[in-house]
C-alpha cells in the first residue's frame, strides 16, 4: 500500500483539495496509508498557498528539507500542488529539479496519470491548466469520517482585487451544476454528516446550471440544501460584500439551519483604500449589509479579513479601519500585513510605510478584535449551546472538542460515542479563543 505524506498551506479550499488528492490516489492504488512523517512516504505532496510571500517561500524551504530523502530514494515521488504551482509552473522544476510533478488546483484529478507519466518517461510533469469543471467530473464520490464536511460549489474568482493572486492561480469563477452539488451533499448526509460548509472563493457568485437549463443562484441553493434530510447545520466560506444580496440576507431570516456566524471580508475601513484595492464597495455599503443582517439575526457573530499597511495607507485611514472594527464589533477575525504579490496591480504601487508601523497597526487591530472575542465568550457563560462534537480535544487528550453554531471551540468531558454527534453543552468557562462546557443531560 502506497504511503502518502501531504502538507497543506493556506485556505479551506486547499484543505478540501488535499482531501481530494488523497482520494484520487486511493482510488488509483486500491487504498493508501496517510503518514505524518515525510521520511516514511512513497509520495510527498505540498499543497501550496501564494496569497502571501511568507507562505510561498516556506514551500521552497520545505522542499529543501525533503531533497535528501529523494537522493536516498530516487523512486520517491515529490509533488507541488496549489496556487504556488499555478503561479510558478516550470520555475519550480528549475529551482528544485528533484520535484517530479507540479499541478494546479484545477488539475489535481490528473495526479495519478502524472505520476505514471513521470515514472515512465523519467521527466518531471507540469500541468497548471484551467480545465474548469472537468476536475469534479473525475473525482471519486466523497467519503468522510467526521460529522462535518466541506462541499465545493464553485471555484475561481473574477473580482480581480488589486492585491490578490487568486484569479491568476485558480482561474475565473465557475460553478458546479446544481444537481452535482446536491448529490454530493445527500451522499454525505447518508454517511452521517450533520454539518455542511459550502465552499468557494466567492460563494455568493454561485450560478449553477439546473436540469432545465435555468440558473440557480446562491440564495436558492441555500434554501434547497436546507431541506436535505440529515443536514442539521449549514455554513459557507467565503463571501464577497459586493454580491451579498438581499435574497441571501433573507436566508438568515428564513433558514434556522444556517448558523449565526458569517465570515465576510472587508479588508479596510477606508473608502480610498477600498477603491485602491478595487473591492467595489464602500465602508457605508458594507455597514448597510451588516445592519440588515443583525436586524433579523441579532446574535449573528461576524468575522472578517483585514489588510494593514496597504500601499499609501495613512494613519487616518488606519484609524477609520479601527473605528469600523469597533462599530461593527467584529469577532475572531484575521489581520495581515500587506504582502505584495508579483503580477498584481498593487505590487506596482509606491509603499512608503515603515514595516515597524505596519506591525504596530497589526497589533492594535488584533487587540481590539481579541477584546471583542473575549467579551462575546464571556456572555456565553451559563448558556446552553447546540454543538457538533469534532473529536478529541487538542488541549487535553482526556477531553472532547465541540464547535458551537457561532464557531466557538468548546472543550468538555464526554464519551467517545458523542464524537460526530450534535449535543447540548452548558458553557461554564470562557477564554479568549475557546470555551469550557459540560454535557446537558436529557
From Swiss-Prot:
Cofactor note: Binds 2 [4Fe-4S] clusters. One cluster is coordinated with 3 cysteines and an exchangeable S-adenosyl-L-methionine.
Subcellular location(s) per record: Cytoplasm
Highest taxon listed in the record's lineage: Bacteria
Binding site for [4Fe-4S] cluster 1: 11, 49, 83
Start and end residues of each MTTase N-terminal domain: 2-120
Residue ranges constituting the Radical SAM core domain according to the UniProt record: 143-375
InterPro entries cross-referenced by the UniProt entry: Elp3/MiaA/NifB-like_rSAM (IPR006638), Methylthiotransferase (IPR005839), Methylthiotransferase_CS (IPR020612), Methylthiotransferase_N (IPR013848), Methylthiotransferase_N_sf (IPR038135), MiaB_methiolase (IPR006463), rSAM (IPR007197), rSAM_horseshoe (IPR023404)
GO molecular function terms noted in the UniProt entry: 4 iron, 4 sulfur cluster binding; metal ion binding; N6-isopentenyladenosine methylthiotransferase activity
EC code: 2.8.4.3
Domain TRAM per the UniProt entry, residue ranges: 378-441
Record field: catalytic activity: N(6)-dimethylallyladenosine(37) in tRNA + (sulfur carrier)-SH + AH2 + 2 S-adenosyl-L-methionine = 2-methylsulfanyl-N(6)-dimethylallyladenosine(37) in tRNA + (sulfur carrier)-H + 5'-deoxyadenosine + L-methionine + A + S-adenosyl-L-homocysteine + 2 H(+)
Top enzyme class: transferase
Binding, [4Fe-4S] cluster 2: 157, 161, 164
Pfam families the UniProt entry points to: Radical_SAM, TRAM, UPF0004
Keywords: 4Fe-4S, Cytoplasm, Iron, Iron-sulfur, Metal-binding, S-adenosyl-L-methionine, Transferase, tRNA processing
GO-annotated cellular components: cytosol
Cofactors that this protein relies on: [4Fe-4S] cluster
Quaternary assembly: Monomer.
Role played: Catalyzes the methylthiolation of N6-(dimethylallyl)adenosine (i(6)A), leading to the formation of 2-methylthio-N6-(dimethylallyl)adenosine (ms(2)i(6)A) at position 37 in tRNAs that read codons beginning with uridine.
Family statement: Belongs to the methylthiotransferase family. MiaB subfamily.
Name of the featured protein: tRNA-2-methylthio-N(6)-dimethylallyladenosine synthase
Species for this entry: Neisseria meningitidis serogroup C (strain 053442)
Amino acid at each position: 500500500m502506497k504511503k502518502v505524506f501531504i502538507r497543506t498551506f493556506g485556505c479551506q479550499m486547499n484543505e478540501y483539495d488535499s482531501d481530494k488528492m488523497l482520494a484520487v490516489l486511493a482510488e488509483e492504488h486500491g487504498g493508501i496509508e496517510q503518514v505524518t512523517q515525510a521520511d516514511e512516504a512513497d509520495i510527498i505532496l505540498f499543497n501550496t498557498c501564494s496569497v502571501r510571500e511568507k507562505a510561498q517561500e516556506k514551500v521552497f524551504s520545505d522542499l529543501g528539507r525533503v531533497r535528501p530523502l529523494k537522493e536516498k530514494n530516487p523512486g520517491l515521488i515529490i509533488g507541488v500542488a496549489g496556487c504556488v504551482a499555478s503561479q510558478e509552473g516550470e520555475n519550480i522544476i528549475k529551482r528544485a529539479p528533484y520535484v517530479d510533478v507540479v499541478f494546479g488546483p484545477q488539475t489535481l484529478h490528473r495526479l495519478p496519470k502524472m505520476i505514471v507519466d513521470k515514472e515512465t518517461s523519467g521527466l518531471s510533469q507540469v500541468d497548471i491548466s484551467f480545465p474548469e469543471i472537468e476536475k469534479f467530473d473525475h473525482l471519486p464520490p466523497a467519503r468522510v469520517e467526521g460529522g462535518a464536511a466541506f462541499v465545493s460549489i464553485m471555484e475561481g474568482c473574477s473580482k480581480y482585487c488589486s492585491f490578490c493572486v487568486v484569479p491568476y492561480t485558480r482561474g475565473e469563477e465557475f460553478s458546479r451544476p446544481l444537481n452535482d452539488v446536491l448529490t454530493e451533499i445527500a451522499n454525505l448526509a447518508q454517511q452521517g454528516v450533520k454539518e455542511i460548509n459550502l465552499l468557494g472563493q466567492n460563494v455568493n457568485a454561485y450560478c449553477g446550471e439546473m436540469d432545465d437549463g435555468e440558473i440557480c443562484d446562491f440564495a436558492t441553493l441555500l434554501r434547497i440544501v436546507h431541506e436535505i434530510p440529515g443536514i442539521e447545520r449549514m455554513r459557507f466560506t467565503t463571501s464577497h460584500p459586493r454580491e451579498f444580496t438581499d435574497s441571501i440576507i433573507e436566508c438568515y431570516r428564513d433558514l434556522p439551519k444556517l448558523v449565526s456566524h458569517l465570515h465576510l471580508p472587508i479588508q479596510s475601513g477606508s473608502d480610498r483604500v477600498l477603491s485602491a484595492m478595487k473591492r467595489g464597495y464602500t465602508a457605508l455599503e458594507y455597514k448597510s449589509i451588516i445592519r440588515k443582517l443583525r436586524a433579523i439575526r441579532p446574535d449573528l457573530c461576524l468575522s472578517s479579513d483585514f489588510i494593514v499597511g496597504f500601499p499609501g495607507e495613512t494613519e487616518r485611514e488606519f484609524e477609520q479601519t479601527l473605528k469600523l472594527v469597533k462599530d461593527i464589533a467584529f469577532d475572531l477575525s484575521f489581520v495581515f500585513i500587506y504582502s505584495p504579490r508579483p503580477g498584481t496591480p498593487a505590487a506596482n504601487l509606491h509603499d512608503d510605510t515603515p514595516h515597524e508601523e505596519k506591525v504596530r497597526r497589526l497589533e492594535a487591530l488584533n487587540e481590539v478584535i481579541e477584546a471583542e472575542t473575549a467579551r462575546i465568550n464571556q456572555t456565553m457563560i451559563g448558556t446552553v449551546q447546540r454543538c457538533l462534537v469534532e473529536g478529541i480535544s487538542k488541549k487535553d487528550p482526556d477531553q472532547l472538542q465541540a464547535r458551537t453554531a457561532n464557531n466557538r471551540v468548546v472543550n468538555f468531558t464526554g464519551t467517545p460515542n458523542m464524537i460526530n454527534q450534535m449535543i447540548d453543552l452548558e458553557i461554564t468557562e470562557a477564554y479568549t479563543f475557546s470555551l469550557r462546557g459540560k454535557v446537558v443531560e436529557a
